[in-house]
């Protein structure tokens, strides 16, 4: 057989495999919808519309208003499982989830499909009574009965999928929802559905980055479809759905979408509080913490990491006991800052205090890093700090989880209060940015796409004394996008 014949055969086999998989996934969606019609019929029999329709009151939480405004908005989701991932969150504590989302979300999505998502309509009132935001009922809506049922259980909005509904069905469900002052998230996944959404006058259009035929995600779908929505329906709110895991992805898509619906990536994280901060604000650190009150201020402002400096000459130096006391102030992920210390000493401090990362601020070379890696507990990250004057430093290649770039003034790196030339950053994907960050430049710095910002002297009233107002102002600036 010729090589070209072999390649052609391979391509044909792959094409058949893909077509078969797409057909299988299309059948999965079709089966979900068939099952939903059966569910509706059974639910109508056990909970007839006449038993609650006359008691329905219009929603008093506007979904449309909640998603309007200049800032990027977030719809955070309560999702226990999904067909593509199976069980996502074993400890599905709705009270805890709602308490976290209440501090960050603009609207909250609740999965109510029982068979495929392990959801329930009973989840809606449980969430709604604990939050101030409008609550979205996310289900495979195929009948106006479901809209009324969603409102009966407290939903302020519903999801309508154009991959499931034809135009006539959509209009019927839309009329039912709007009659109760409920909002609608109209979901599209391709160009044809997009044009239908525009023709139907959808006010909030969700672009599903997941291919419903093979369950893969592609964030470029938002980039491809959003400009058409902007052109044809400039007043519509565009929401990017599925596949959002990092703040860098959010920043990348923020120029295309007005907001994001995020579920699976948050639900998979044990520490939901920090997970929401990471995706909405970035993985930001407040360094130079010396007191539990300051740790609490950093945490309340929105930090993910807290820095403890074990360098004696620093104005913000801590020893083991003061570090332990400081850590009692807030459940941050704590980073120990060291400079040319013995590897055994660093490993001992990290292990004893349960630090999440080590930040090396001295002349530590690759050999030192490699040795330290073998001494640290599994999962502890190593960050390497580099002083930046007027040229980009050479970054170590191996066993470094993050590179921290800080301003260098003379021979001093860190704690200078100076800003270096940010054009020297290069690829920001593994960079923590430090050096002279303050409420005045935090918004600009956050636009650079780094993993996170490292705040210190710019949010202090005195060395080692964090200022609550400056911290709040800095994180407000970071969130202002």
UniProtKB/Swiss-Prot annotation:
Complexes and interactors: Monomer.
PROSITE patterns in alphabetical order: IGPS (PS00614)
The protein's Enzyme Commission number: 4.1.1.48, 5.3.1.24
Region (Indole-3-glycerol phosphate synthase): 1-283
Organism (species): Vibrio parahaemolyticus serotype O3:K6 (strain RIMD 2210633)
Listed InterPro entries: Aldolase_TIM, Indole-3-glycerol_P_synth, Indole-3-glycerol_P_synth_dom, Indole-3-GlycerolPSynthase_CS, PRAI_dom, RibuloseP-bd_barrel
The protein, known as: Tryptophan biosynthesis protein TrpCF
Region of interest called N-(5'-phosphoribosyl)anthranilate isomerase, as start-end residue ranges on this chain: 284-481
Cross-referenced Pfam families: IGPS, PRAI
GO biological process terms held by the UniProt record: L-tryptophan biosynthetic process
GO terms of molecular function: indole-3-glycerol-phosphate synthase activity; phosphoribosylanthranilate isomerase activity
Name of the encoding gene: trpC
Function: Bifunctional enzyme that catalyzes two sequential steps of tryptophan biosynthetic pathway. The first reaction is catalyzed by the isomerase, coded by the TrpF domain; the second reaction is catalyzed by the synthase, coded by the TrpC domain.
Keyword NADP: no
Source lineage: Bacteria, Pseudomonadati, Pseudomonadota, Gammaproteobacteria, Vibrionales
Pathway stated in the Swiss-Prot or TrEMBL entry: Amino-acid biosynthesis; L-tryptophan biosynthesis; L-tryptophan from chorismate: step 3/5; Amino-acid biosynthesis; L-tryptophan biosynthesis; L-tryptophan from chorismate: step 4/5
Catalytic reaction(s) noted: N-(5-phospho-beta-D-ribosyl)anthranilate = 1-(2-carboxyphenylamino)-1-deoxy-D-ribulose 5-phosphate; 1-(2-carboxyphenylamino)-1-deoxy-D-ribulose 5-phosphate + H(+) = (1S,2R)-1-C-(indol-3-yl)glycerol 3-phosphate + CO2 + H2O
UniProt keyword annotations, A-Z: Amino-acid biosynthesis, Aromatic amino acid biosynthesis, Decarboxylase, Isomerase, Lyase, Multifunctional enzyme, Tryptophan biosynthesis
């Amino acid at each position: 057989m010729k090589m070209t014949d072999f390649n052609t055969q391979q391509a044909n086999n792959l094409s058949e495999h893909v077509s078969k998989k797409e057909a299988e996934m299309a059948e999965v969606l079709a089966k979900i919808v068939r099952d939903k019609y059966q569910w509706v019929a059974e639910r109508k029999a056990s909970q007839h519309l006449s038993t609650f329709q006359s008691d329905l009151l219009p929603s008093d939480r506007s979904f449309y208003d909640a998603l309007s405004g200049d800032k990027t908005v977030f719809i955070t989701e309560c999702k226990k499982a999904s067909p593509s991932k199976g069980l996502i969150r074993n400890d599905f504590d709705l009270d805890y989830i709602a308490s976290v989302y209440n501090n960050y979300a603009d609207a909250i999505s609740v999965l109510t499909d029982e068979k495929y998502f392990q959801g329930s309509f009973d989840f809606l009132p449980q969430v709604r009574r604990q939050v101030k935001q409008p609550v979205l009922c996310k289900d495979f809506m195929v009948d106006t009965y479901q809209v009324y049922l969603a409102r009966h259980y407290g939903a302020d909005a519903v999801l309508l999928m154009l991959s499931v509904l034809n135009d006539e069905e959509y209009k019927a469900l839309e009329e039912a929802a709007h009659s109760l002052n409920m909002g609608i998230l109209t979901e599209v996944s391709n160009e044809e559905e997009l044009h239908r959404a525009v023709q139907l006058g959808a006010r909030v259009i969700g672009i599903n980055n997941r291919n419903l035929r093979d369950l893969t995600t592609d964030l470029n779908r938002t980039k491809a479809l959003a400009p058409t929505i902007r052109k044809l329906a400039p007043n519509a709110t565009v929401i990017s759905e599925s596949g959002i895991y990092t703040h860098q992805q959010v920043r990348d898509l923020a120029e295309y979408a007005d907001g994001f619906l995020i579920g699976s990536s948050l639900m998979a994280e044990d520490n939901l509080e920090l997970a929401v901060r990471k995706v909405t604000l970035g993985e930001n650190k407040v360094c130079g913490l010396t007191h539990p009150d300051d740790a609490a201020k950093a945490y309340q402002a929105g930090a993910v990491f807290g820095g403890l400096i074990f360098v004696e000459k620093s104005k913000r130096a801590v020893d083991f006991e003061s570090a332990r006391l400081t850590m009692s102030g807030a459940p941050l992920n704590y980073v120990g800052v060291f400079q040319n210390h013995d590897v055994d000493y660093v490993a001992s401090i990290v292990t004893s205090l349960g630090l999440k990362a080590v930040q090396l601020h001295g002349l530590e070379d690759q050999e030192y890093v490699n040795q330290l890696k073998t001494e640290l507990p599994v999962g502890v990250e190593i960050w390497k700090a580099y002083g930046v004057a007027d040229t980009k430093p050479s970054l170590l290649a191996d066993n470094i989880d993050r590179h921290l770039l800080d301003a260098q003034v003379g021979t001093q790196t860190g704690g200078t209060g100076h800003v270096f030339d940010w054009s020297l950053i290069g690829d920001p994907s593994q960079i923590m940015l430090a050096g002279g960050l303050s409420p005045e430049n935090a918004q600009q710095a956050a636009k650079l796409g780094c993993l996170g910002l490292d705040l210190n002297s710019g949010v202090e009233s005195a060395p080692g004394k964090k200022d609550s107002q400056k911290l709040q102002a800095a994180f407000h600036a970071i969130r202002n996008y």
